[in-house]
Amino acid sequence: IYFLAGRYEFRDKGIDIYIKALGKLNEKLKQEKSRKTIIAFIWVPANFRNIKTQILENKTLFQDIKEALEEVMGDVEKNMIYSFVSNKKIAKEILFEDNFLTEMKIRVARFVRKGNPPVATHDLYDENDTILREIYESNLKNGEDDPVKIIYYPIYLSGADGLLNLNYYEAMQGSHLGIFPSYYEPWGYTPLEAGALGVASVTTDLAGFGRYFCTECSQSETPGIYVLKRLNKSHDDVVQQLVEVMFTYS
């Protein structure tokens, strides 16, 4: 799980670099025939209308499946124990009653959707939102064969948003790599916060913290904090640096 979090400053926060690099990482993982899946979050608040109806419906249907399974777990446990002590092969027909399996098929059929999952969790007022446009231009579609799945989450992580229901630090702790490829940042605490929580991160030599942490130093192959070289480097060069970091870390 990778993430970028911060204010909606598309260029200064390096959101453009992050999305472009994810698009190239997606293609690189395909070429390598990698079996890995990267979930890439963009936790950047924007002017949203509401949570997408499709997501709310699927959340309700998933909860229905979960609760139906929880109701029969006592019987499932008994059936599993019986199968073990009887040295019988465990099969779903032994674990579950026929009527439960039939009902579950109906529930799953309602849950399964055609097409690709949406790249944003909310409907936005601006149909030409810069982040959304960059996602589409980078060919990030959340297709079944795409190793990189992107989730644009345009709401503050309050811990009670109706979806993740995690606060900022909880969401960060549940991730593996925080990416902050800033073009300008007087200091920038986010890589430091990630490190304090035991999460690896990426910063740049144009951010105050990145310059303090490592300007001329030679980094190891897998440092806890990666420092991209953005000073006097082209946009494409920085994108490629980030692609290599994300690919190595995956």
Task: For the regions a language model picked out, list residue spans one by one.
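Beta-sheet entry/capping signal
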Residues: I1-Y2, D16, T37-F41, K149-I150, ...
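A structural signal for short secondary-structure junctions
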Residues: S34-R35, E144, M172-Q173, G195, ...
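Short, well-ordered loop/turn and helix-capping segments at boundaries between secondary-structure elements
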Residues: R11, K24-Q31, A46-R49, L177, ...
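Conserved catalytic-core segment of nucleotide-activated headgroup transferases in glycan assembly
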Residues: I1-Y169
